Structure formats: structure tokens, C-alpha cells
Regions:
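ATP/Mg2+-dependent ligation/transfer catalytic cores
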Residues: 1-156, 178-184
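Charge-rich, low-complexity amphipathic helices
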Residues: 101, 105, 165, 169-170
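Short, conserved phosphate-binding/catalytic loop or strand-edge motifs used
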Residues: 96, 160-168
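Histidine-centered active-site/metal-ligand motif
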Residues: 158-159, 172
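Short, hydrophobic beta-strand segments
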Residues: 56-62, 166-173
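Acidic, glycine-rich loop-and-beta core segments that form the ion-binding/anion-interacting portion
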Residues: 165, 178-191
Length: 191
């Protein structure tokens, strides 16, 4: 939509939802709106939705119509243009590490690993164990199904050293495309 907007302050929030101490220096005290422009190349299905649903990544623009300098996608595009000016094209293969946790509805409760198919929680390190990954086979299979439906180029999944800590590797490819895929993957894993 032409009138899609977000407040600039979203770009200076921390991972906890707080604002940086230099908020006003970065986006100004008025907290103006950015204009959002959808990138049709990022359109993907939402396979877990009960009704047919799509998702799309937007580029952020200032009120003057310029790419917003703080939007992470725009920062990456600037870096890629620097590479292009040198005649280079970066090829990347992201690795995303994350923890599986038991569903938790009370934010006061401690996060714990989920119960595996054996009926037990992990209690010790299971670095690179195939059996440890297999404990979570239902969620792993669903993850691969969701990734395939969204055309995410995921490859190898391994168990890392922490309790229920996983690492997924993406296939090598275009930096912007894979950054978008990682963004979608993170949302997918939260579902």
C-alpha cells in the first residue's frame, strides 16, 4: 500500500524493546514515520497460517523519498554497492544458532529445554550429536517443511553445545536474498 508507514524509532530499539540513549540523535525527537515500499521479490507464503496468507519484506524510506540510512536492509544494500564498485559480488552462507525451549506462557518462569521424544529433557551437552537432534524430530521435520514451502535455502542442521541449541546452515548465495531468508527463518522458528 502507498500509505504503509512505521515510526523511525523502531530502527533504534534494542532487543529488549528499549530505546538507545542516543535515540534523539539518530532519528530526532519528533519520531517521524518512514514510508514502506514492498519488495515483491521477498513475497513468501506463511505455511502455518490457517487461511492463505503471504508475507513480504518492505524497504524503508524517509519522508524525502530516500532509502532510510538506519534500516538494516538499506545498510546491507549500501555495502553491496561498495563491493559492486570494486567489481566484486559477495557470496555468503549464513549460519543461524538458536535454542529450542518449552512453550512458556508466564514471562516470570525460567526458560527450559523442551521434552524430547524420549520423554526427557536434555540435561547435558550433546555437541554435534545426531541422536540429540533426533530427540526433536517432529519440530525439525516441521521446520524443514515450513522452509521448503517458503523456498528458504536451508541445508544442514546440527546440535550445538548448549541444551537444545541448534545451528542451521543456509546454502551459499546472494547476500541480500539470504539476509531476507534469515529474517523469514527467524520468524518461522518462533512459530
Amino acid at each position: 500500500k502507498e500509505d504503509s508507514r512505521l515510526p523511525e524509532s523502531i530502527l533504534v530499539q534494542t532487543v529488549t524493546g528499549d530505546y538507545t540513549k542516543i535515540h534523539d540523535q539518530l532519528v530526532g525527537p519528533m519520531d517521524g514515520d518512514m514510508m514502506l515500499q514492498p519488495d515483491p521479490d521477498t513475497m513468501r507464503l506463511v505455511p502455518w497460517a490457517s487461511d492463505p496468507t503471504g508475507q513480504i519484506i518492505h524497504d524503508c524510506y524517509t519522508r524525502d523519498g530516500e532509502l532510510h540510512p538506519l534500516a538494516s536492509r538499506n545498510v546491507l544494500k549500501r555495502v553491496l554497492r561498495l563491493y559492486e564498485a570494486e567489481g566484486w559480488k559477495p557470496v555468503v552462507a549464513p549460519e543461524v544458532e538458536y535454542y529450542l525451549i518449552q512453550k512458556n506462557v508466564d514471562p516470570e518462569d525460567e526458560l527450559v529445554p523442551p521434552i524430547g521424544r524420549s520423554g526427557r529433557r536434555e540435561a547435558g551437552r550433546q555437541s554435534y550429536s545426531i541422536d540429540a537432534v533426533n530427540e526433536f524430530e517432529p519440530i525439525v521435520e516441521e521446520m524443514y517443511d515450513f522452509c521448503e514451502a517458503q523456498e528458504l535455502d536451508v541445508d544442514t542442521l546440527i546440535h550445538e553445545s548448549g541444551l537444545a541449541q541448534m545451528e542451521i546452515n543456509f546454502l551459499h548465495g546472494d547476500a541480500l536474498n539470504l539476509a531476507d531468508q534469515v529474517f523469514v527463518f527467524k520468524r518461522t522458528m518462533r512459530e
